[in-house]
């Protein structure tokens, strides 16, 4: 029986490939493999997922809303009123966190689109999803501001650190349920 490796090496020497070319290629591939093995894995990492800023906490209802072009409908009457923090949300990301958070085209709040019932919208009826699919982190060790919660009545995300849980579109105050989310508030607007 013949050895396949020896046959390959012998065929390389018997073909038009010279011994010098063979060792030259062997050296190039060997060095390339060694370099690839020594590089940190981050050298091959994907670029960070895209993020959208201009998300604000409403001073009146405590919900997170998009402040990019209009103020939306607030359940505490009128339009949302943003505070000084500018939150950046990751979208279209396979990374860690909970997906299915969407912008409501009617009230401009961020709501969870993972249930068949789309929650109660301050602009009437249910929320209407549009735009990006946002991913929210919920690890307490993650960088950012914690104590953001899902309201199980209206299905928006709201800030739950203060004793005031904010005004809910489904009536009275928000009711926190599930995970404690962490939002990136590294960009401040003063």
Question: Which residues are covered by each model-predicted region?
Answer:
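N-terminal export leaders
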Residues: 18-31
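N-terminal secretory signal peptides
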Residues: 1-21
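Short Cys/His-rich "knuckle" micro-motifs
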Residues: 68-71, 83-85, 114-117, 131-132, ...
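C-terminal segment of N-terminal export signals and the immediately downstream linker at the start
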Residues: 16, 37-63
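Short Cys/His-rich metal-coordination motifs, predominantly Zn2+-binding knuckles/fingers
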Residues: 61, 77, 107, 124, ...
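Residues immediately within or flanking Cys/His clusters that coordinate Zn2+
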Residues: 55, 71, 101, 118, ...
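Short cysteine-rich clusters marking metal-coordination/redox-active sites
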Residues: 58, 74, 104, 121, ...
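Cys/His-rich microdomains that often coordinate metals
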Residues: 65, 78-81, 111, 125, ...
């Amino acid at each position: 029986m013949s050895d396949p490796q020896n046959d390959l090496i012998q065929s390389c020497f018997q073909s038009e490939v010279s011994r010098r070319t063979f060792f030259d290629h062997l050296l190039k591939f060997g060095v390339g493999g060694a370099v690839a093995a020594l590089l940190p894995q981050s050298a091959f990492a994907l670029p960070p997922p895209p993020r959208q800023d201009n998300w604000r906490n409403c001073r009146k209802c405590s919900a997170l809303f998009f402040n990019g072009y209009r103020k939306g409908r607030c359940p505490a009457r009128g339009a949302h009123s943003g505070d000084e923090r500018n939150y950046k949300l990751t979208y279209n990301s396979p990374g860690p966190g909970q997906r299915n958070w969407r912008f409501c085209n009617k009230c401009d709040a961020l709501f969870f689109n993972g249930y068949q019932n789309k929650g109660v919208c301050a602009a009437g009826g249910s929320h209407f999803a549009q735009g990006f699919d946002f991913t929210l982190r919920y690890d307490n060790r993650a960088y950012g501001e914690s104590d953001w919660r899902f309201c199980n009545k209206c299905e928006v995300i709201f800030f739950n650190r203060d004793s005031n849980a904010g005004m809910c579109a489904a009536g009275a105050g928000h009711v926190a349920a599930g995970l404690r989310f962490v939002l990136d508030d590294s960009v401040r607007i003063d």
